[in-house]
């Protein structure tokens, strides 16, 4: 397998540039221990869905080149992308999975490249729930499932009914299967693939977050009834089960307290304080997670939030409860070139800063931040295409190139 040189990524000449003040002398480039590993700097690539796997969910040669390029600076933590934990968890074309041997073998080749660069890897386990594609699931004989039969918008209801795959609530037996079989199977394959960490996606309106949120959880059993303890029960069960599988020091969790993405209501401090208290109790008993990835209130899903709408929202409550590491992510470039917010947030010695959108257009982002080189602005129009154009290359011929499975 040939891996492309990082020098082959040339953006269009009219790409907007963002000026950067050199950050090499800041805490951003000081080491931090994450689980059993010491990262020599505090920059993480946080997950970006890009649809470049093969159509049957096997990581591709395009992804190998992509992650190799973004792990070139030693010690970078690469959290690959949202990755299906099971077939029932989602079946969108060209999204990678980590639930079978072929997928694990392909991810292993990507991890070998990341580790060969002296960097680290984490996989984000994804379960879509009510925002999955009803027709694609129907075509594979799979149900559209959620905490409750509450669609996230009118169009999703229309499409589900047209597909003959209407949304229904998970049974308690199905929930047990998700906890005891589906997530552990994905986590075991992640270990076989060589990932350093396994991150549970508990944010942005996907299945585990749907249980947390009153807009999507109308259950009347032990997973609902409006109580915080019940709504957080599934998430904490998944955490506890995966601690058994991968070990706490290799396990992580992503949360988005202020997101209102995909029909969700803002959850805020209350339920997330409870979750963090529960995780801290586990840490106090020797089961501390590697990190918690927390989305800043500057972002909700794929959208930036105005300064006006951010008022009264802060993640400071979380840093007072959880004493372990945080990955803090969400539009840290908004005050470039000075990056005052980033520098201030690093005063908390347990913080790593996550970037995603600007990593898509700057494979050498870490070096640019260190040396103060301008950043290429990202091209959102090419985020969710299947071809290589806008991913590893801006050569027009790459619009004909689709990823080939690595295994």
Swiss-Prot record:
Any one GO MF annotation of this record: estrogen binding
Cofactor: FMN
Enzyme Commission number(s) of this protein: 1.6.99.1
Reactions performed catalytically: A + NADPH + H(+) = AH2 + NADP(+)
Gene of this entry: EBP1
PANTHER family, per database record: NADH OXIDOREDUCTASE-RELATED, NADPH DEHYDROGENASE 2-RELATED
Functional description taken from the UniProt entry: Oxidoreductase that binds mammalian estrogens with high affinity.
Residues at which substrate binds: 201-204
Tagged with keyword Zinc-finger: no
Protein name: Probable NADPH dehydrogenase
The entry's keywords: Flavoprotein, FMN, NADP, Oxidoreductase
Family label: Belongs to the NADH:flavin oxidoreductase/NADH oxidase family.
Binding residue positions for FMN: 49, 124, 254, 357
Keyword Nucleotidyltransferase carried by entry: no
Site (May interact with the steroid): 225
Active-site positions on this chain: 206 (proton donor)
Native organism: Candida albicans
């Amino acid at each position: 397998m040939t891996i492309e040189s990082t020098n082959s990524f040339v953006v269009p000449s009219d790409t907007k540039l963002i000026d950067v003040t050199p950050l090499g002398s800041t805490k951003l480039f000081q080491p931090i221990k994450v689980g059993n590993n010491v990262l020599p700097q505090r920059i993480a690539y946080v997950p970006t869905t890009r649809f470049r796997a093969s159509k049957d969910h096997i990581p591709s040669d395009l992804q190998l080149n992509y992650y190799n390029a973004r792990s070139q600076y030693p010690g970078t933590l690469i959290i690959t992308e949202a990755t299906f934990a099971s077939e029932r968890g989602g079946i969108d074309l060209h999204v990678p999975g980590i639930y079978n041997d072929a997928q694990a073998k392909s991810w292993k080749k990507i991890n070998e490249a990341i580790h060969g660069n002296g960097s680290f890897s984490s996989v984000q386990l994804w379960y879509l729930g009510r925002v999955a594609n009803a027709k694609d699931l129907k075509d594979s004989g799979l149900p559209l499932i959620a905490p409750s039969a509450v669609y996230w918008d009118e169009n999703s209801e229309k499409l589900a009914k047209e597909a003959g795959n209407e949304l229904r609530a998970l049974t308690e037996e199905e929930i047990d299967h998700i906890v005891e079989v589906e997530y552990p199977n994905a986590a075991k394959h992640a270990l076989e693939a060589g990932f350093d960490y396994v991150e549970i996606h508990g944010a942005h309106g996907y299945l585990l977050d749907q249980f947390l949120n009153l807009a999507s959880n109308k259950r009347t059993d032990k997973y609902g009834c409006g109580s915080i303890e019940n709504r957080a029960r599934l998430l904490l069960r998944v955490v506890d089960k995966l601690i058994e599988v991968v070990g706490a020091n290799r396990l992580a969790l992503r949360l988005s307290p202020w997101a209102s993405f995909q029909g969700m209501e803002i959850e805020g401090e209350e339920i997330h304080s409870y979750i963090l208290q529960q995780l801290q109790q586990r840490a106090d008993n020797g089961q501390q997670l590697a990190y918690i990835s927390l989305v800043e209130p500057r972002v909700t899903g794929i959208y930036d939030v105005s300064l006006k709408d951010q008022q009264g929202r802060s993640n400071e409550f979380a840093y007072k409860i959880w004493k372990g590491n945080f990955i803090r992510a969400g539009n840290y470039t908004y005050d470039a070139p000075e990056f005052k917010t980033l520098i201030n947030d690093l005063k908390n010695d347990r913080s790593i800063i996550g970037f995603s959108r600007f990593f898509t257009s700057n494979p050498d982002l870490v070096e640019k931040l260190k040396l103060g080189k301008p950043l290429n602005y990202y091209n959102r129009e090419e985020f969710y295409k299947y071809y290589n154009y806008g991913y590893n290359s801006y050569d027009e011929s790459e619009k004909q190139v689709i990823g080939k499975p690595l295994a």
